[in-house]
Amino acid sequence: MRDLVRGYAAAVLDGAGPDTGRIVSELGSFGAALVHFDALRQVLTDATVAPASRRAVVVDLLGGRDSARTVALLGFTAHYEHASELAPSVAALVGLAEQVAAAPGADLVEPPAGRSAARERLRGYADRVFEELDDAAVDRVGDEMFALSRLLDRTESLRHVLADTDVPYRARAAVLEDLLAGRAAPATLRLARYVLRNGRTRDLVGTFEWLVELAARERGMRLAEVRSAVELDTAELARLATALGRLVARRVTVRVVVDPTVVGGLLVSVGDLVIDGTVRLRLERLRDVLALSS
């Protein structure tokens, strides 16, 4: 099973509650249909059929009969799983759902993973969470993830506790819940909990910053990180977003990191584009000139 699909499945099953047993049954029935119905198997495992078309076949076949969660999960799997691996992937989904059904109310902790695999799982999980939100709610998640990344960046003790896999997951999740409960949206807490149980906590700050970027992409926007010695007001942020949007030909959402070391001016990053208009840079260049002339 692709890590992307596994992450999406984890998000679907997290919110299933008493419907998990039904999902297990429906996944099993679909897996059996792939075995017994040649025409269905041929269409869904044909790599020349467009992924969106494979997804549409699943949705048309199951919509109105199976639960909405099952339809979403199997449609996503048909779209993103390698066509030749669809049947084994569905079988793996049955096993995953059975694990969740056997431990109701418990979060399924993922096995350890490398950076790429962990990011793919998290992207799949976030895809499902964002599907359930409107644009304003996605914006709020992005804001809260950014605030959390800044808090972790400046609070080493908190970062260490949350990243320490020798501490049981439930204890670390409790710390996170105490921190966010009543302050953050349920979707933010849900994503943050998955980060802790996703098999890789080595770079929590970078991971939460990446989620901010995913939230921006979900709205068809680019993320701009701006480092400034002082906070920017609403009007300044709006002007900056407009100017950067013209530059990259996309709508831009701006997140500001207050960094006194820039002295003055701004350091702007939009993907690979970096614009350094800081006083710090000008001072460094002046020092270089003075060093050469002495």
Task: List each language-model region with its residue ranges.
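Elongated, mostly alpha-helical coiled-coil "stalk/stator" tethers of large membrane protein machines
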Residues: 1-294
